[in-house]
Swiss-Prot record:
GO terms for cellular component: cytoplasm; cytosol; endoplasmic reticulum; nucleus; phagophore assembly site; TRAPP complex; TRAPPI protein complex; TRAPPII protein complex. The gene is TRS20. It comes from Saccharomyces cerevisiae (strain ATCC 204508 / S288c) (Baker's yeast). Belongs to the TRAPP small subunits family. Sedlin subfamily. Part of the multisubunit TRAPP (transport protein particle) I complex composed of BET3, BET5, TRS20, TRS23, TRS31 and TRS33. Part of the multisubunit TRAPP (transport protein particle) II complex composed of BET3, BET5, TRS20, TRS23, TRS31, TRS33, TRS65, TRS85, TRS120 and TRS130. Part of the multisubunit TRAPP (transport protein particle) III complex composed of BET3, BET5, TRS20, TRS23, TRS31, TRS33 and TRS85. Gene3D superfamilies: 3.30.450.70. This is Trafficking protein particle complex subunit 20. The keyword Endoplasmic reticulum applies. Its main location: Golgi.
Amino acid sequence: MPQYFAIIGKKDNPVYEIEFTNAENPQGFPQDLKELNPFILHASLDIVEDLQWQINPTSQLNGNGGNGSNGGGGFLRSRAVNNTDNCYLGKVDHFYGLAITAYISYSGMKFVMIHGNSANSSVVIDDNNMRSFYQEVHELYVKTLMNPFYKITDPIRSPAFDSRVRTLARKHLSK
């Protein structure tokens, strides 16, 4: 099952892009779909930004504090019960059998992935593995931000970053 992953900046600029393939499908997405992937991903950003500002219904019901319980706007809507997981938005969109998942940082960086399928069946996403993948890639991104020679708007071209993201994909996405 191929996946196309991107980190999108605050101004909807791509900061990092990569396609993951597996042994079953080493070519990844078909060529015509490879060209459409950035457009599909950017089309889903509107949904991600809408979800970003929705009030978290669990914090409103449970009175867990935060913006949701006092009637103000919430920062991140999530299916998560605790506040540590509320950056992971889960499946936010679909496009002709492709699922799109998202994670958004508190600084407004969007981590978005298109999940392809190897057959004409619907894509099944393991939320726990996806959440772990996004959280670990976010940690790598934060470490990249700590580099004094990196500007937040520049694309990430580090081979070390790329290698670590590929390792995380093998660890979390190939299950």
